[in-house]
Amino acid sequence: MKKALIAMSGGVDSSVAAKLMLDAGYDCMGATMKLFDSDDILMAQREKTCCSLSDVEDARSVARRLGMPYQVFNFKGDFKEKVIDKFIATYEAGGTPNPCIDCNKCLKFDTLCRRAITLGYDYVVTGHYARIDCVDGRYRLRKALDDKKDQSYVLYNLSQEQLAHTLFPLGELHKDQVRAIAEENGFINAHKRESQDICFVPDGDYAAFIESYTGRHYPPGDFVDTQGHVLGRHKGIIRYTIGQRRGLGLALPAPLYVCKKDPESNTVTLCPNDQLNSTVVRVTEFNWLSIAAPAEPLHAAVKIRYNMHQAPCTVEVLPGGDVQLTFDTPQRAVTPGQAAVIYDGDTVLGGGRIV
């Protein structure tokens, strides 16, 4: 009998994933990753995080109801080093990170997967909405059947070895079906609200989290236009992201948007909306997942942020391994630090970090 370790967040998706794996005949154990102490999170946010006591108890309740063992694993050190510290460093360098991608690669499908294998489990199972198949000996990551819930974008950075030890039982289901299964089985979290924010910054105030967590102060500096003329003062470079208009605190004759952040000069550059468009973007740390790196340029589709439609582009591998994307139609507010993930239909070809 194959054995599966279920990564349980306390939410409905991972709970139903556990139920489906048991129904499929797997020997299962539930596990929740403890990623940070609540003392590390602002007081007002503690009970909103995925590592709150209530979430652990929800996961434990479902595991008990399903009659499977359950453990909590302490991965705080790895999470701090590989996710939180990188999140902060990216903001300080002027980028806008996506820590969920790093958590998936480094924690769920690395640290947790290695723990699972050590304990004798064959697979790690999560409640992600995505699919995996294998063609000619190569694993492919594919979009979920439910396009509105698809999470393949945040999974592009997995390796072939990680895909080989991963199962996504929700990939063929829609969210309403998942909630119905939870309700039929009396799960305590059947109607639990989904988290839409970064787990360790659930209120979305990234700057406040960074200042509280590091104890550092990020000084004010100048807003400038594209010619370098000073337009006013900003409140610290970590408080802004590319494409932002609201919250600038400036009285301007026409709308301006953040188009560049320069940590060295501590300036934030503003421009009109029509100057936010990009035709070409460079992507680094590229992970070719479902195919090997192509020798010739190829035409594909790309997502440059989580909640966007795919945009057609030409993909070219550069000397050294970086990738250049040339959009068929200019794209607005391409943001350094975010992921660019390329698709062929519903298959994830690969992705990397925008520079």
Residue ranges and their predicted role:
Residues 1-156, 167, 176-177:
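ATP-dependent adenylation/nucleotidyltransferase module used to activate substrates
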Residues 125-132, 137-355:
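AMP-forming adenylation/ATP pyrophosphatase catalytic core
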